[in-house]
A protein has these predicted regions:
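Bacterial N-terminal signal peptides
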Residues: 13-24
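N-terminal substrate-binding region of glycoside hydrolase catalytic domains
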Residues: 31-135, 144-154
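Aromatic/acidic polysaccharide-binding cleft in carbohydrate-active enzymes
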Residues: 267-329, 345
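Short, well-ordered coil/turn segments that N-cap beta-strands
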Residues: 39-42, 65-67, 97-101, 141-145, ...
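C-terminal beta-strand-rich structural cap/linker in extracellular carbohydrate-active enzymes
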Residues: 397-421
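Active-site cleft segment of glycoside hydrolase catalytic domains centered on the general acid/base Glu
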Residues: 53, 82-85, 113-220, 226-245, ...
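Bacterial N-terminal signal peptides that target proteins for export
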Residues: 2-15
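Carbohydrate-binding surface patches
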Residues: 345-382, 389
Length: 421
């Protein structure tokens, strides 16, 4: 019995070691946005205002198909956090609504605050930011799905351009402290670039160098960008350029997250229906490029002026009314749930994204501009259902099968043809 017990004991020890090794390997593979689990072609987040978001809002966000919400966390300094938001409580509220949090850690455009008096005597701003960021990560690792370090450091609003070298030092300090304290969340992205890094020279070299160093040290798992632009379709080529630049720098494991992007509806520039078209296409082109995470800016309009761009990025009005962008996107999400990308092309000025859901192929068709006739090739005997999302959702027949398929007019307002047996 002793011999048998010893053998069993050794076997159990080996089994335990193997389990630890396998778990460690699984965890390592799971790091980064590539490991995000989602019910949709792209995991979708929406930006919220920590000071005004209600529990009813959070529940409605989840019911609409969003899986994440993004908000900034700032240190307890009046210059950058005048309301002294209770962030731990907000994180709990987000979790209670069955949403995941994207938390952007930001210290102020002087790295620590915005005024000289924010920096206490003898303290280094780099250390103060690192202490704050690492401490907050450590306290909430289990409750936050995605951490983002900084927000648009290539924009003077969020980083004083005179402090580029200091930012590089602050990033290095943060990574060193994370390693020293063994703080290693599954997803840490940076830095929420306003411009496309490594392409075109719009991002200062110090910021690019800081990112590469942080990614190579396994401090940052992914890069985060804010690809604002007049029309969404041009983002596809930019994603490819960025991917190539990351690979060139031996950052093949570094993923791409879109941590902020949206369109405002404001007079006389853009109607609510045009905003809805652009927001919808923003999601589609992100899915087409295989990007795993998109944060839409924003949940609710900031103000009530019809002529202010900054007041009108929401998919909900300031008064809480659903805008056309909300309706179109959320109706699409209901259909696209549990679907995966099959293919994408933009031949002859028509964008075609094909998704597969169960036994159905979902062909989403649109153009960046004028209408174009398009035919979806379909073998005889297949059924086709057409879904329009604008100005409201309508299901109907695709019409008769002609020229080996079903025809539609593609426009700036996407239409979906669902092909099934």
């Amino acid at each position: 019995m002793k011999i048998f017990s010893c053998r069993v004991g050794r076997f159990l020890q080996v089994l335990a070691l193997l389990s630890v090794w396998m778990f460690a390997g699984h965890s390592a593979q799971a790091r980064g946005v590539s490991g995000i689990g989602t019910d949709y072609p792209v995991a979708l987040s929406v930006q919220i205002d920590p000071a005004t978001i209600t529990d009813a809002d959070l529940n409605e966000i989840r019911a609409a198909g969003f899986e994440f919400v993004r908000f900034g966390v700032r240190p307890p300094l009046k210059s950058v956090n005048p309301s002294l938001i209770d962030y731990p409580r907000l994180i709990k509220r987000v979790r209670n609504a069955k949403l995941e949090a994207i938390v952007t850690l930001f210290g102020g455009n002087a790295i620590w605050g915005t005024k000289p008096e924010d920096l206490r005597a003898g303290a280094r701003k780099e250390s103060l930011f690192s202490d704050f960021a690492v401490g907050f990560m450590k306290a909430h690792t289990d409750d936050v799905a995605v951490w983002e370090v900084w927000n648009e450091p290539d924009h003077k609003t969020f980083l004083n351009p005179a402090l580029l070298s200091d930012f590089e030092a602050a990033s290095s300090q943060l990574c060193a402290d994370m390693a020293k304290q063994k703080v290693q969340p599954n997803i840490v992205v940076g830095f929420g670039f306003a411009n496309l890094p490594f392409v075109g020279g719009k991002v200062p070299a110090q910021l690019e160098n800081a990112f590469v160093a942080a990614a190579k040290s396994d401090c940052l798992t992914d890069i985060s960008i804010h690809p604002y632009r007049p029309v969404p379709e041009t983002a596809f080529a930019d994603y490819e350029k960025l991917r190539a630049q990351l690979d060139q720098r031996q950052l093949q494991k570094t993923g791409i997250a879109v941590s902020e992007w949206g369109y405002a509806s404001y007079l006389p520039v853009r109607s609510q229906s045009t905003q809805a078209s652009l927001v919808f296409r923003e999601y589609l082109i992100t899915a087409a490029a295989g990007i795993k995470l998109l944060n839409l800016y924003a949940w609710r309009d900031r103000g009530r002026s019809s002529f202010s761009k900054e007041d009108n990025f929401g998919i909900m009005s300031n008064a809480g009314e659903k805008k056309e962008a909300f309706s179109a996107l959320t109706e699409f999400l209901k259909i696209a749930r549990h679907s995966k990308k099959v293919s994408y092309d933009d031949a002859k000025g028509v964008s075609r994204l094909v998704l597969k859901r169960d036994d159905a192929l979902l062909h989403v068709l649109w153009t960046p501009g004028s209408e174009k006739d398009v035919t979806v090739p379909v073998t005889e005997g297949k059924k086709c259902t057409r879904v329009d999302f604008f100005p409201q959702m309508r299901r109907g027949s695709c019409g008769p099968r002609t020229d080996g398929g079903f025809s539609a007019k593609a426009s700036a307002y996407p239409v979906l043809l669902s092909i099934s047996d």
